[in-house]
Amino acid sequence: MGVKLNICLLLLLVAIISSQGFNLRKKEDSKDEKPFGNYRRGSPCSNYEGSCTPNHIPCPPGSHECRQLPGCYPGVERCCCQY
């Protein structure tokens, strides 16, 4: 009986360790590396309540392009400021 208990405990331990390793390999989709319209802290664009928007997407309603404000990735994004 002692041998069966040891085998059961060993199998339980292996199952727990295996499931923990599987959880570590899951990709977290909630974190986006470069979200649209994110605010660059401390940049002139964000200081004037602007947001960096990709060049191929128009500025959101109620905002306009602020060419004079840097702070977004050049050639990829532009600053869209509130009116």
From Swiss-Prot:
<protein>
    <recommendedName>
        <fullName>Small cysteine-rich protein 3</fullName>
    </recommendedName>
</protein>
<keyword id="KW-0964">Secreted</keyword>
<feature type="compositionally biased region" description="Basic and acidic residues">
    <location>
        <begin position="25"/>
        <end position="35"/>
    </location>
</feature>
<keyword id="KW-0528">Neurotoxin</keyword>
<keyword id="KW-1015">Disulfide bond</keyword>
<dbReference type="GO" id="GO:0005576">
    <property type="term" value="C:extracellular region"/>
</dbReference>
<comment type="similarity">
    <text>Belongs to the Cnidaria small cysteine-rich protein (SCRiP) family. alpha subfamily.</text>
</comment>
<feature type="signal peptide">
    <location>
        <begin position="1"/>
        <end position="21"/>
    </location>
</feature>
<keyword id="KW-0732">Signal</keyword>
<feature type="region of interest" description="Disordered">
    <location>
        <begin position="25"/>
        <end position="44"/>
    </location>
</feature>
<dbReference type="GO" id="GO:0090729">
    <property type="term" value="F:toxin activity"/>
</dbReference>
<keyword id="KW-0165">Cleavage on pair of basic residues</keyword>
<keyword id="KW-0166">Nematocyst</keyword>
<dbReference type="GO" id="GO:0042151">
    <property type="term" value="C:nematocyst"/>
</dbReference>
<comment type="function">
    <text>This recombinant protein induces severe neurotoxicity on zebrafish larvae (Danio rerio) at a concentration of 230 mg/ml, but does not show toxicity when injected in blowfly larvae (Sarcophaga falculata). All fish incubated with this protein died within 16 hours of exposure. Has also been claimed to be implied in calcification, but this function seems improbable.</text>
</comment>
<keyword id="KW-0800">Toxin</keyword>
<feature type="propeptide">
    <location>
        <begin position="22"/>
        <end position="39"/>
    </location>
</feature>
